[in-house]
């Protein structure tokens, strides 16, 4: 088991944290031609999307994909950048008021704000990509997004408690499944982050379910999506129209 984990770790670390944008057709080559279910679903995805940007499969892919995709969109939307920056600036105080220790979250928040300030200078895409490929910067962004998700879940614990299995409190769930690095994300994490930052996320779900079409969910329901992600069991990548 330890050897298997090590092999998976080696495979993961050989993949870029965030890749270049690629033609969506690269997905067809990832599955056997006779894998009818996936080939049909990729064809269906092609009706709506043209490109994909992959993320490293390390358990942090949802946060990294969300972070990069939204910040990339902010390079061309100064109004949303100002709104988002104001929410992000205030978020540290919100977390401290909830009981998070200021000195433990400060560095993560500072890195997050630094990156938003970089976006304000309208750098080239390569500069933003460079930040997300720098493991220390990229991981600090992931940690802060995890903290924001945890904070929102705990603030709205009355609502989210119903979705948590195993008799755990929302706080226990956050300490075990949200805040630690490499913990995979599910609907509950996506709902919380989308609402915490007021950024709509659309996820296309590509799995082995019957039928040749890909189902999607928008978080929160009925909102206008800004971030488009592809989910394959255990992993998220970024989609482009």
Positions of predicted regions on the chain:
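Eukaryotic N-terminal, low-complexity and coiled-coil-prone scaffolding/targeting segments
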Residues: 1-25
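Conserved aromatic-histidine-acidic binding/catalytic patches
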Residues: 12-15, 53-59, 177-181, 227
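Papain-like cysteine protease catalytic cores
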Residues: 18-22, 26-49, 70-207
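Structured, charged interaction cores in eukaryotic nuclear gene-expression proteins
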Residues: 47-68, 75
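Beta-strand cores of modular interaction/reader domains in eukaryotic scaffold and signaling proteins
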Residues: 51-56, 62, 202-204, 228-230, ...
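Conserved beta-strand elements of beta-rich interaction domains across eukaryotes
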Residues: 59-60, 68, 208-210, 234-236
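A short acidic (Asp/Glu
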Residues: 63-67, 73-74, 213-216, 240
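Charge-dense, extended regions
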Residues: 199, 213-241
């Amino acid at each position: 088991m330890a050897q298997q984990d090590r092999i998976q770790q080696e495979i993961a670390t050989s993949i870029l944290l965030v890749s270049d944008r690629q033609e969506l057709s690269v997905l067809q080559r990832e599955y056997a031609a006779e894998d009818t279910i996936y080939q049909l679903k990729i064809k269906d995805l092609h009706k709506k999307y043209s490109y994909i940007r992959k993320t490293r499969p390390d358990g942090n892919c949802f946060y990294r994909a969300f972070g990069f995709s939204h910040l990339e969109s902010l390079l061309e939307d100064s109004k949303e950048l100002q709104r988002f920056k104001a929410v992000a600036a205030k978020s540290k105080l919100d977390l401290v008021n909830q009981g998070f220790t200021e000195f433990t979250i400060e560095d993560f928040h500072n890195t997050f704000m630094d990156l938003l300030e970089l976006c304000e200078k309208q750098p080239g895409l390569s500069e933003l990509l460079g930040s997300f490929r720098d493991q220390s910067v990229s991981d600090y962004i992931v940690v802060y997004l995890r903290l924001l998700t945890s904070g929102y879940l705990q603030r709205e614990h009355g609502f989210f408690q119903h979705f948590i299995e195993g008799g755990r409190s929302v706080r226990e769930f956050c300490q075990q499944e949200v805040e630690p690095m490499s913990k995979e994300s599910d609907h509950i994490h996506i709902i919380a982050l989308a609402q915490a930052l007021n950024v709509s996320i659309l996820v296309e779900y590509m799995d082995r379910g019957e039928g040749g079409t890909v189902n999607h969910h928008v978080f929160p329901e009925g909102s206008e999506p800004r971030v488009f992600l592809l989910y394959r069991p255990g992993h998220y990548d970024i989609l482009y129209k």
